[in-house]
């Protein structure tokens, strides 16, 4: 979510991994009365949605899709694309720091088979949003781009369909939830473990659920979960400490997500410190459904996949959070009492080999997937470099939640 001038995107809760629902789950689809019009293919990487975009005829560039955010273009494209900057804004993110962003207009933006014209964008250094994430993104498309449409996201087909509101077939569209939009923030009423609240729906977040600090404090949620993993998430404005737990249920209208992986934020400033929101529902939850944002009609539709996608809400079994660098995987955090900590891996270490393979031959999504999806008891042999010395360690996965 990068909302209004609140610029944020969650990097990860430890290791967010790519997970594509089963491609044969096609008993549901985008609810339109007519043949598909504007169709935008996308990639799902690390539970982020990426589309291929052409800007003023140049590209293609990889843009992330955040229906709860504003439109952004990377600052590095301003000069080569001759974009005119007309003003500056100050934004806030998950942390306490402020960031600067410029204003510009993109005359032509091509996504899939659809062309947008004269769209307002902000310029921003997008490396701050997803540092070392293994995917170089050059822009973001958000709520202003989709405000005129019912926007359907089909995670199974990896397609976004822009539907004329008059052509939206509401009968088979699924469970309907009233939806509000303010400063590009899309919200619904939901409940976590029986506690109701107003939650943001955020396709810019790869996580299942993050609960804001005031909500956590008010309902004394930390004391309810003695079993947790302490970690951090980062983005614009710095990083935020959080406790990751497994809740009982997240209720969305008539639908329920059982045992959702949930981050309890510990923040004094930034988006996660907002008292007007209970929390943030991300793609880890949304990928269970065909999701239709009817912004003109102020409704959110959720159609569950049949059968349900596999491996939902499996959690990182290593305790590692890593980013990618040219020579390997840099250790960003090590959760206390986890296999990574017990193996002697430390923050700042560089993982140069994994099971005998150079880390440079393995993509970041692949290693994240391995560390989460391999069963408990699986052993990884890693070459770990501290300063100028390399040692071999054994990391044995186990269930942490």
Cite the ranges covered by each PLM segment:
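Pepsin/retropepsin-fold aspartyl endopeptidases
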Residues: 19-401
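Bacterial N-terminal signal peptides
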Residues: 8-18
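N-terminal secretory signal peptides that target proteins for export/translocation
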Residues: 1-5
